[in-house]
Amino acid sequence: TAGLPEVDLWLPLAEQDQWGERLAQALGRSFPGGRERILTTGPASAYLKISEGCDHACRFCIIPQLRGPLQSRPIEELVREAGSLVAQGARELVLVAQDVANYGQDLGMRQGLQQLVEALSAVTGLDWIRLLYLYPVGVNKELLRFLRDSAPLVVPSFDIPLQHAHPDILTQMGRPFARDPYRVIATVRDVLPQAALRTSLIVGYPGEKEAHFAYLRQFVQEVRFHNLGVFPYYAEEGTPAATLPDQVPEAVKNDRREQIMGDQAQISETILESCQGTTMDVLVERPDPHWPTLFQGRVWFQAPEVDGVTYVSGHGLQAGQLVHA
């Protein structure tokens, strides 16, 4: 604080429910009251942050330093917010946290995510629940069977941030719990054979050799994710990885990213082509501005903002409507 005198007010992340009062007090104004969240992400879908912070110690990540350890929000509070968002028109809630499978552990809950989903299932008007993100360490058959049995409310589309596939690199990343990503994927597909999987990967982590990258690329080609994101490693100041030797040149990082993204583009195209001639529910989000009978939406394996959109033709469709097309 002393080193940043230009900062007028520090607001702890754990006290977000008090930010309004604190800001008003700092400005010498009265606080009008009311803490209902306003839906700003679109008329059909909303993000619901279920926890703050992270208990994992990945060496490339600064989030635990910035946001502290896991701090789960109470179920009652989340159900109230969910009800408010649905009342404003949201039909899909995207549960977000650094690790949604970890939800409730700091509150002494053994099956926190399951309890939360069961509580949210009572919210009238809610059609879909989507989970972002499931850390590999939390992926087990007990949870997967629950998610399978919670369909169609919980869509069988999961983002599992693996970050890499080679066990040596995963260990160097501080992710020994994820040393066998093949096993993680096999566990999911054993319980949910039709699940859509997406992941995020880091290329060019310090010490990543050509053999490590070739292993990762083969993994992507064999697993065939519906979608994935690839990020060149960035040396975040204050993280252990930033001081590691064997830093990979930027040009090599970018080239490796392009190679995997090229592989994934072909995989995603093949998966989408396999959907031709099938019917599935489309969550309508908005009309096309140029064609009055064309509407933009998403199917169950398309997460908001990152996995593309689906267009459906019709008359008088409304945002938030589920259309079987």
What name fits each language-model region?
Residues A87-A211, Q221-E222:
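Conserved SAM/AdoMet-binding glycine-rich loop
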Residues G104-S121, G125, Q172, Y233-Q266:
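Radical SAM enzyme [4Fe-4S]-AdoMet core and its adjacent flexible, acidic
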Residues L4-P5, L27-R29, Q111-L113, L147-D149, ...:
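Short, hinge-like loop/turn segments at secondary-structure boundaries
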Residues Q25-F31, Q105-Q114, K141, R179, ...:
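Short, glycine- and charge-enriched coil/turn segments that flank and shape catalytic ligand pockets
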Residues I50, L95, L131, I160, ...:
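Residue-level signature of catalytic and energy-coupling elements of molecular machines
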Residues G53, Q98, P161-A165, Y233, ...:
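Generic beta-structure capping elements
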Residues T243-A325:
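Terminal RNA-binding accessory module
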Residues T1-Y103, F158, R179-T187, F213-A214, ...:
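Proteins enriched for Cys/Gly/acidic motifs involved in redox and nucleic-acid/cofactor modification
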